[in-house]
């Protein structure tokens, strides 16, 4: 059985967090849900997270600070930032994907997650059978 990929999901809105958690779990992902970005960063530092999905606007420690902290620890970890604010300057956050809340279908979010996880894993490698056999050996007779 293929191991589940782990997504760290962060949003101060408990209802939004719960909806995303259920949506992702029904698609086979393991979800670590946090409503506090600082606690989420502490959990991320423990390891085992494959992707981060976070809201931008949160009290105190916002999503862009969370992503900055995550990229400091693990630059290759993909991050998706969700926000109701769509100003251009807010797109410069270090996130791999920026989605405006209410402007995407859940299927688009799921596809972005899938693609980022594939990209993180890298291209599939061709598995070549390696033969331990070298050139034929000649045995000299005495």
Language model features with spans:
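Short amphipathic alpha-helix used as the core "switch/output" element in two-component signaling
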Residues: 42, 64-76
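Active-site residues of response regulator receiver
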Residues: 55
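Acidic catalytic/metal-coordinating carboxylates
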Residues: 35-36, 62-65
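Short hydrophobic/Thr-rich beta-strand motif most characteristic of the beta2 strand and flanking loop
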Residues: 28-35, 43
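Conserved acidic segment of CheY-like receiver
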Residues: 4-15, 20-24, 52
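Non-catalytic signal-transmission and effector/linker regions of two-component phosphorelay proteins
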Residues: 1-6, 107-142
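Receiver (REC) domain active-site loop signature in two-component systems and cognate sites
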Residues: 58
């Amino acid at each position: 059985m293929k191991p589940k990929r782990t997504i760290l999901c962060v949003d101060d809105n408990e209802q939004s967090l719960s909806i995303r958690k259920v949506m992702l779990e029904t698609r086979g992902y393991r979800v670590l849900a946090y409503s506090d970005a600082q606690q989420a960063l502490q959990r991320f530092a423990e390891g085992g997270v494959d992707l981060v999905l976070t809201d931008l606007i949160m009290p105190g420690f916002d999503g862009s600070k969370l992503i900055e902290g995550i990229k400091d620890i693990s630059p290759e970890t993909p991050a998706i930032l969700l926000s109701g604010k769509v100003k251009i300057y807010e797109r410069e956050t270090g996130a791999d994907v920026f989605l405006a809340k209410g402007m995407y279908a859940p299927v688009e979010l799921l596809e972005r997650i899938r693609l980022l996880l594939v990209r993180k894993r890298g291209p599939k490698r061709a598995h070549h059978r390696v033969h331990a056999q070298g050139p034929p050996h000649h045995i000299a007779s005495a």
